[in-house]
Curated annotation (Swiss-Prot):
Protein name: Probable endonuclease 4
The protein's enzyme class: hydrolase
A Pfam family that the UniProt record links to this protein: AP_endonuc_2
Residues reported in the UniProt entry to bind Zn(2+) 1: 68, 110, 145
PANTHER family: APURINIC-APYRIMIDINIC ENDONUCLEASE, ENDONUCLEASE IV ENDODEOXYRIBONUCLEASE IV
Enzyme Commission designation: 3.1.21.2
């Protein structure tokens, strides 16, 4: 099973450090931002220590890199032309950086927000942006992420994702990242009807479009449209449904990426939960007490 988490690509070790962090969690895949997600500052590709990282990945059984595009990319913006043009040009740069990592197959992208113009207008704008970016020669696919429906986010329904894909000329370079927290918060019933949700996705989008799974529990009840991640088994989705998802026959080949919150009462000393969460999801054994020394409460 390909399972891992978001890891940091920063400091002197860059991608090598990210691979070392992933290995410390027992991961077999990992997700990185190629720079800070909230700005456009980027280190040169030559500084990322890619050859050393690829060797370390091979030695430690880390099969694949998932790249996440920065949050500042909003292809759905219809009110500020400069924001849209920045999104288009910067996404193109991020694709080239992802390709340079060699082990990356997908770059996850939040489709965008219409900022008040409405879903139909926003979808058209996203299609326009993707058609400007994609040439058909890309070595990585843009994985459109399913969204929770917070604010004016586009991508909260499978129909919206399908509409974007249908409008893009080189849509063979598009895939989908299914985020469990987002799908739950958008109203889909992963707890009682996982097969029904996947059948609906297959009918509307196509199950073969799935490229990445973001595995997150949710602090919110189903349909809340709030997008607040929780540690595996401690949220409203629960451990058993998430365990079923990561082991589902139709999803077995996909990289599963955890984006759950760090643990600890002191904001300066919080620690990553990923080693424990990966181990629990692999084994199927949920430990409701493992956070106690760090947070002081169980579920």
């Amino acid at each position: 099973m390909k399972i891992g988490s978001h890891v940091s690509l920063s400091g002197k070790k860059m991608l090598l450090g990210a691979s070392e962090e992933a290995a410390s969690y027992g991961a077999t895949t990992m997700m990185v931002y190629t720079g800070a997600p909230q700005n456009t500052r980027r280190k040169p590709i030559s500084d990322l220590r890619i050859p050393e990282a690829l060797l370390h990945m091979e030695e430690n059984g880390i099969e694949e890199i998932v790249v996440h595009a920065p949050y500042i990319i909003n292809l759905g913006n219809t009110t500020k032309p400069e924001t849209f043009e920045l999104a288009v040009s910067f996404l193109g740069e991020e694709i080239r950086r992802a390709e340079a990592l060699e082990k990356a197959k997908h770059i996850v992208l939040h489709p965008g927000a219409h900022v008040g113009a409405g879903e139909e207008v926003g979808i058209k704008r996203i299609i326009e942006g993707l058609n400007e970016v994609l040439t058909g020669d890309e070595k990585v696919k843009i994985a459109l992420e399913t969204m929770a429906g917070k604010g004016s986010e586009i991508g909260k329904t499978f129909e919206e994702i399908a509409a974007i894909i249908a409008g893009v000329t080189h849509n063979d370079r598009l895939s989908v990242c299914l985020d469990t927290c987002h799908v739950h918060d958008a109203g889909y019933d992963l707890i009682h009807d996982l097969d029904g949700v996947l059948e609906s996705f297959d009918r509307i989008v196509g199950i073969n479009r799935l490229g990445v799974i973001h595995v997150n529990d949710s602090k919110n009840i189903r349909g809340a449209k709030k997008d607040r991640h929780e540690n595996i088994g401690f949220g409203e989705i629960g451990f058993d449904p998430l365990h079923r998802i990561v082991h589902h026959r139709d999803l077995a080949h996909l990289p599963k990426i955890l984006e759950t919150p760090y643990i600890g009462l002191d904001p300066r000393k919080k620690v990553a939960p990923y080693r424990e969460e990966i181990a629990m999801l692999r084994s199927g054994n949920f430990d409701a007490e493992w956070r106690l020394p760090l947070i002081g409460t169980s579920i």
